[in-house]
A protein has these predicted regions:
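Non-transmembrane "mature" sequence context
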Residues: 1-128
Length: 128
């Protein structure tokens, strides 16, 4: 039985940009972040976040994309630490934490704070 070469061609895969956009919007929603707050986290504007919500893709190599990837690391690490419990994650994210020198939700609004929170969560996960 012969197979045409077109049936052997790889299927197109969803690009990294749309996947990153969808993931960062989902993580922000699960942590209770509003568009304005997410815009600060990824160094963007509220209008840009609105465009993301309507299908615009983030370029992973852009400044916004790199910050979005760091924010996803925060979410993924926190999700693993709380066993997938979004309510516990939201409580942790919005509670004063001496180890990150503030409230994580506020700290992630700056690049330095975002990196500090990522490093803290990575260290905590590393001890488990």
């Amino acid at each position: 039985m012969m197979t045409s070469s077109s049936s052997l061609a790889p299927r197109p895969v969803l690009g990294a940009g749309p996947v990153l956009s969808k993931a960062v919007l989902s993580a922000a929603s699960r942590l209770g972040l509003r568009s304005r707050h997410l815009a600060l986290v990824i160094g963007s504007s509220e209008a840009s976040i609105s465009r993301l919500q309507h299908g615009r893709a983030l370029d992973p190599a852009s400044k916004e994309g790199e910050l979005a990837l760091l924010f996803l690391r925060v979410y993924r690490s926190l999700d693993a630490l709380v066993g997938g419990d979004d309510e516990k994650a939201r409580v942790w994210f919005n509670t004063l934490n001496d180890h990150v020198a503030g409230v994580p939700a506020e700290r992630v609004r700056t690049v330095e704070g975002l990196v500090d929170v990522v490093q803290y969560l990575d260290a905590v996960r590393g001890r488990l």
